[in-house]
Amino acid sequence: WVYQGLILNCFQILPVATAFVGFAIARWQYKGGKKSAAVVTGMAVVLAVWGLFLVVHAGDDWRTAMRYKFLAKETLPDVDQNGVRFTPFDVAYNDMIQKFGSAEFSISRNRMHAVDIDGSVGFVAPVTPEGVVGTFFWKQDGFMVFSDQPGLQPTNRVKRVKQPFASGEGMLILDDIWRSLYLRDPFCFYPEIYYLQVGAEEFVAVAPKIRYAYEFPCYWVPYWAGTTIVDSSGKVDSLTREEAIADPRFKGKRLFPQSLARTIVESQKFDEGFFSGFYQRPGLIRIPVLPGGQQMPYLYRTHDGKDLYVIATEPAGNSSALFRLYMIDAHNGALSVWELDPAKGILGPDRAGERVKSISGYTWGYTHDLLESFPLPHQGILYWKYTVSVISGTGITFTAVVNTTNGEIEIFHSREDFDDWLAGRARKKPQGFTPEMEKEMQDIRALLQGALKKIEKISF
């Protein structure tokens, strides 16, 4: 906390110190009868503090944008058909909770991450001790794992992996994994801990490290400084970026810090200089706020097996057209960008979601909601994939993909139906089968179930 709270924030303390000293001088002048001078001093202090905050905060973004340059791409790589994230984060978490029964342990959505599972995309959440006694004396008791692999039956997607960790999350004082990390390297920042599969039922904790490079006169620029690995025995290995990338256990897997990927893209509003982020100009970007709790970047696997963090941006202002799609290699941090002409009106994620909400028969925001605006490049066309779920996020009502060029919507009522479309196979359900028809069928089933219950009562 000394490093992060004092050293990294030393330049942000400067405006506060300036304000304190300046207003002390103004107060002294006011008491001495120099009221006009006190007013002038006070106004000067306000301007100085505002200017210092501006230089410090915006300057960090500006220097970050100058450090990280994106390679322009002419085309967008197609998605891997076996690596599409079909199940949203919230639905996967609720499925884990439903199948997890324990009074002494718990799983937290804040500790759950999307990672590679059995060669496909999935989710892993650590099983951590619960309660005052448990957090001091019990160990992190393995993981809940959700596999989003195609072809699996819903009952086989969630499993419990028993792998106690000697140093883990939710374990206080000496066994706390955060303590182990900062004892190994106190002069860095660990934005996240997630767990990668290195065997059939074996995982290791992965903690990417971020350090800050000083740039004159008062800027700190973040960079990926390596990765710390903690195994179940509590052994801590600190790897450089090159060592982590070359480690055969993590071949092609997520290593680059997700939060740093977002920071780098956010800084691109200053890509044309310090003042370029403060006025409306061609090329100024914004990252839209998406429906549901999960925001970009999303982890996306290409047809050649690369995992990418993808962040879609729109022109700053009131435009909702897709402008740039930033891609950061989740394994080695390579940067690329796909730029479109906003005048062509390619649908961005928020406006495409409004198209899905135009489907009648659902009370959006009360009974049903959209989850995860997921980018889905397929056969040379970019789609946005949405999951429509009940408001609690406990199940999937249907899945929709929106064509970004013409706004057409495809509806899928099952994972098999979606996989058939993705693979170019003939879909088993008729094209005219709509969400409204599905809702009517659900209502009829509910009426029939109610009638059967009444018959059973009468028979009894």
What are these regions (language model features)?
Residues 1-460:
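Soluble extracytoplasmic regions of secretory-pathway and membrane proteins
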